[in-house]
Amino acid sequence: MIYYIVALVIILLDQWTKWLVVRHMEIGESIPLLDSVLYLTSHRNKGAAFGILEGQMWLFYIITSIVVIGIVYYMEKEAKHDRVFATALALILGGAIGNFIDRIFRGEVVDFVNTYIFTYNFPIFNVADSALCVGVGILFLKMIRDERKAKKEKNA
């Protein structure tokens, strides 16, 4: 149950921050937070990461629905006794639903975190995107750890 609360907190934080951007900023407006490094920039994305598949909303609806159903299934069946796995899935679930809400009600995703890494202007993102990336990163690291553990047990 706690993991669904984590997902809900991600969704609420994501939607609240997007609401603030939509309400208080014009599209394209940028507010420096840390000059040359971090900006709040009001941006809209009609596609996926990096703007790919722009205008393919029906595809996002189908994929997101399948992903959400799969995550809930795994949270109920597989992750009950694995806190790391459940946390990763909760982050992914919250992020997926956060962006799904935008696609359903706005027809686009509100992005606003604009960072520069050295001279590279990283694609603008939001709270949901961050949760998705952290969740996937945790899953990736968990898979590596589990694989190493299985090899170690096999060789013992």
From Swiss-Prot:
InterPro entries noted in UniProt: Peptidase_A8
Active site, per annotation:
111, 129
Please state the pathway this protein functions in, per its UniProt record.
Answer: Protein modification; lipoprotein biosynthesis (signal peptide cleavage)
Protein's membrane topology: Multi-pass membrane protein
Enzyme class, one word?
A: hydrolase
Q: Is Metal-binding among the key words of this record? A: no
* GO terms for biological process, alphabetical: proteolysis
What sections of the protein cross the membrane?
52-72, 85-105, 121-141
- Outline what the protein does: This protein specifically catalyzes the removal of signal peptides from prolipoproteins.
The name this protein goes by in its record: Lipoprotein signal peptidase
- Organism, by scientific name, is Halalkalibacterium halodurans (strain ATCC BAA-125 / DSM 18197 / FERM 7344 / JCM 9153 / C-125)
Q: Which gene encodes it?
A: lspA
